[in-house]
Amino acid sequence: MIRIGAHMPIGGGFKRVPKETYEIGGNAFQIFPHNPRQWKANLPKEEDIKLFKEGIKKYKIDPEAMLCHSGYLINIASPNIETWNKSLELLILEMKICSTLGIKYLNIHPGSHLKSGVENGINQILKALNTAMEKEKNTFILLENVTKKGGNIGSTLEELKLIIDKAKFPDRLGITIDTCHAFDAGYDITNKEKLNEFLNKIDKYFSLEKLKFIHLNDSKNDLGSNKDRHENIGKGKIGSEGLKVFISHPLIQKIPWVLETPGDNDVHKKDIQEVLKILEVK
């Protein structure tokens, strides 16, 4: 069975997420654990947790297809000690929120080294991950591939490998592949041969077991542009034919897909329908 969904709003509480996921035709989802544009976050209220978990059972959502996405302000690669400390503190709280909700996976962007260099940035990332994962043992952290702009770390599989290889708790680390980010970073996932090379490299560096989620997005920009601008399914430079190559691969079909395309739930419902149409799923 294809597991597909979208990034869902949490306004009004986490309790709304399972039902709204079902209403857009999904059986997987991603959420923010708090307002992503604020440093402040709170643990969910007991009633919200209870109703959320009841909804998960009612709508038969696979626990392996539920994902939290870290807030925008976190930068655990930062050379600025104040920013790094605040990022670490919020990351630990996000892991607690995930655990409270019964969500196993937290997706994070590795962060930007802010001109301090990749090596220094990776060292900062490792310090943060090791500390956070020592304190919170129930949450798996997934490193998302990103585009190279702004000193971002993780635009290549090699950089993600460096982090996981040196981490203290590699068994609780995995990766998320964002199709827009991969395409914009120069990985041609629209070509069968190149896609196989990409997946073989993932298997060689991490094992495919580490690939836990796909962020399924089209791209507004060309291959290798390093822009990171998501587009709705079939309307971008990856396009319907390119996405068909990617999502038709049997290995990709084993992994949950979450859309982060522009628009609200109604738009995401149409995007999910478009994905299934591309796959020729009735």
Swiss-Prot record:
Segments traversing the membrane: none
Binding-site positions, Zn(2+) 2: 144, 178, 215, 260
PANTHER family on file: APURINIC-APYRIMIDINIC ENDONUCLEASE, ENDONUCLEASE IV ENDODEOXYRIBONUCLEASE IV
EC number: 3.1.21.2
This protein's UniProt keywords: DNA damage, DNA repair, Endonuclease, Hydrolase, Metal-binding, Nuclease, Zinc
Domain of life from the UniProt record: Bacteria
Underlying gene: nfo
Catalytic reactions on record: Endonucleolytic cleavage to 5'-phosphooligonucleotide end-products
Protein family per UniProt: Belongs to the AP endonuclease 2 family.
Binding site for Zn(2+) 3: 181, 228, 230
Protein name, as recorded: Probable endonuclease 4
UniProt GO MF annotations: deoxyribonuclease IV (phage-T4-induced) activity; DNA binding; DNA-(apurinic or apyrimidinic site) endonuclease activity; phosphoric diester hydrolase activity; zinc ion binding
Bound cofactor: record note: Binds 3 Zn(2+) ions.
